[in-house]
């Protein structure tokens, strides 16, 4: 796997960060390319922040609305805070994804403004 990422803080938490003192702030973002190893994410309690995943190439498998679905290149997934996150990538499908985690007191209003 190729993993390129940037993080706001030195300390990284699997649960992410919540900051309601600012309108919007990016906690971390990155790109991952899965070439030889499969990847499985199992976050039963979700995270404290929002997450957007963009599938640039290949596909990803996501458990959404009580069913597994396969999303191909060009699709985006949004996870709100506290929403369980179950997803996987299979190296044979050559997934290349971009992701971002963000938080803030205006996040939900911004998403609503764009009907998201």
Region roles according to the model:
Residues 75-77, 98:
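Protein kinase-like catalytic core scaffold
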Residues 1-70, 76, 108:
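Generic protein-terminus/edge-of-domain signal
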Residues 108-116:
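Amphipathic alpha-helical segments enriched in hydrophobic/aromatic residues interleaved with Lys/Arg
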């Amino acid at each position: 796997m190729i993993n390129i990422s940037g993080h706001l803080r030195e300390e990284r938490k699997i649960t992410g960060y919540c900051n309601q003192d600012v309108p919007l702030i990016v906690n971390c973002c990155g790109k991952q390319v899965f070439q030889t190893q499969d990847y499985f994410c199992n976050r039963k309690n979700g995270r404290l922040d929002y997450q957007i995943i963009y599938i640039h190439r290949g596909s990803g498998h996501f458990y959404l609305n009580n069913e597994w679905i396969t999303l191909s290149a060009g699709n985006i997934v949004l996870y709100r805070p506290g929403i369980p996150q179950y997803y996987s990538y299979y190296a044979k499908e050559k997934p290349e994804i971009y992701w971002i985690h963000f938080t803030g007191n205006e996040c939900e209003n911004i998403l609503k403004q764009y009907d998201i």
